[in-house]
Amino acid sequence: MTTNTYNGWTNRATWNTALWLTNDETLYRTMLEHFRDEEINNKNARFFCNLLWPCSETPDGDELADVNWNEITDMIRESVETDES
């Protein structure tokens, strides 16, 4: 049996994007602050990441075009909800 996932995420690009957004405290706090005032959806998640990484890839070179934005949006939503409780 083989799996087509990467560390529980759809692919490496999605995992790496989530890793960058959640493993750097300053970036994580910036993300939380941004999404307290913005609707959490795929378009806004991608826009936020493009602001962070204008070259359209993570600092590790993973293309944002390959990211599963549904998973990133869910992760952001869960992070914001957890922080508010």
Task: List PLM regions with ranges.
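Acidic interaction surfaces
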Residues: M1-S85
